[in-house]
């Protein structure tokens, strides 16, 4: 609480200035969309990849319908942390501590074992790639933080930047970035230069799929109840942060553009009010699920993606598609993995929505989003059973 109050309290001092900057950006984008004869900014931003607006709007609609599942997660979190009342700052502490280290060699071995569900050819490509020294693995002075895969050169293999810290998050990040890398390899091997590069809308799907495969593997390999709870809780938190939080941002961003398109003038105070209404609805503030104090409604100022024009929704659609494709692998490992790899090999050979539809995932329809919600509820059912077993 002290950290949140100090951090967002300082941001609040700049609300008027940051509001002016964001409002100016929004007005510019609306003017550019009108000048180019688009109906609105959403239509303009989806045009390049020929994405139906129904993808964006169905995502927002289905996630709003699923808010009771998000609230169930918060109540489970409250129970596991032993809190009388959840506040916004209680979302981030880990549910269970894991005293386990994953050095880089262990990380490689676990990843190869977990990815056996994708077939021998996948494992061979990944194992051979490990031996080619494509990765800069460890943190060092002057190195940027985070993790990144670079695969821009058609005739050159991908490079991976990592900052491995021997923890489970580093292991999950390792799998994530190799999802990008092998996607790039498959696309380069199967497509000519002109159609090898894939759209952002597709890019995060392989990475999120590999995280799901890893998580399921780790749960099955866990030796204690607390270890299982850690992996399940880690996966739930990723779903919250990607499926719900990014959709919340997407809904907020759409509301901002629609307000400007109606001719409304947006100040820092008005933007904060709009964000506050959405963040409180998502977190069940009025129902007492998670209390979001006024100060924390300044959070919108912290998010750089609001200057990227309708970008964040793709994180949520990616985890949705990744969950659907992984579900097909679980149903029929051979056919599901072949279908998955066919999508990766397709690169940018067609519009991303059409490629996904051919892989059996139609994101204009409610079913893929509902499958994510079903998966979250199944994880929480499993966690509640484990908690009862542990507490006996």
Stretches with model-predicted labels:
Residues 34, 52-55, 103, 140, ...:
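Secondary-structure capping and boundary motifs in well-ordered enzyme cores
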Residues 38-43, 85-87, 146-157, 177-189, ...:
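Active-site-adjacent bridging/hinge elements
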Residues 50, 79-89, 174, 209-212, ...:
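C-terminal, non-catalytic "cap/extension" segments appended to globular domains
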Residues 70, 74, 78, 199-215, ...:
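Conserved catalytic alpha/beta cores of large enzymes that bind or transform nucleotide phosphates
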């Amino acid at each position: 609480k002290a950290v949140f109050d100090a951090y967002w309290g300082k941001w609040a001092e700049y609300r008027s200035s940051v509001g002016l900057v964001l409002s100016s950006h929004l007005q510019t984008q609306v003017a550019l969309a009108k000048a180019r004869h688009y109906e609105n900014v959403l239509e303009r931003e989806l045009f390049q990849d020929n994405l139906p607006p129904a993808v964006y709007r169905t995502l927002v609609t289905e996630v709003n319908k699923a808010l009771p599942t998000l609230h169930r997660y918060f109540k489970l979190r409250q129970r596991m942390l032993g809190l009388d009342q959840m506040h916004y700052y209680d979302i981030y502490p880990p549910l269970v501590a894991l005293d386990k280290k994953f050095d880089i060699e262990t990380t490689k071995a676990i990843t190869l074992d977990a990815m056996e569900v994708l077939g021998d050819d996948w494992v061979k490509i990944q194992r051979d790639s490990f031996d080619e020294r494509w990765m800069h693995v460890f943190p060092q002075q002057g190195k940027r933080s985070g993790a990144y895969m670079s695969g821009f050169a058609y005739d050159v293999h991908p490079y991976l930047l990592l900052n491995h810290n021997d923890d489970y998050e580093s292991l999950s990040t390792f799998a994530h970035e190799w999802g990008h890398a092998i996607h790039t390899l498959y696309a380069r091997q199967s497509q000519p230069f002109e159609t090898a590069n894939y759209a952002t809308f597709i890019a995060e799907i392989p990475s999120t799929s590999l995280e799901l495969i890893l998580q399921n593997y780790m749960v099955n390999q866990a030796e204690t109840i607390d270890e299982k709870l850690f992996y399940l809780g880690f996966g739930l938190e990723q779903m919250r942060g990607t499926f719900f939080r990014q959709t919340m941002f997407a809904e907020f961003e759409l509301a901002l553009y629609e307000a400007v398109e109606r001719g409304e003038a947006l100040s820092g105070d008005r933007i904060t009010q709009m964000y506050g209404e959405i963040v409180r609805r998502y977190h069940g503030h009025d129902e007492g699920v998670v209390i979001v104090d006024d100060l924390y409604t300044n959070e919108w100022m912290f998010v750089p993606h609001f200057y990227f024009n309708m970008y964040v929704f793709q994180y949520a659609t990616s985890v949705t598609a990744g969950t659907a494709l992984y579900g097909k692998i679980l149903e029929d490992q051979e056919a599901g993995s072949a279908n998955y790899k066919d999508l990766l090999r397709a690169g940018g050979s067609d519009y991303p929505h059409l490629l996904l539809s051919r892989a059996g995932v139609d994101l204009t329809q409610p079913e893929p989003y509902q499958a994510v919600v079903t998966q979250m509820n199944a994880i929480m059912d499993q966690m509640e059973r484990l908690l009862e077993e542990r507490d006996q």
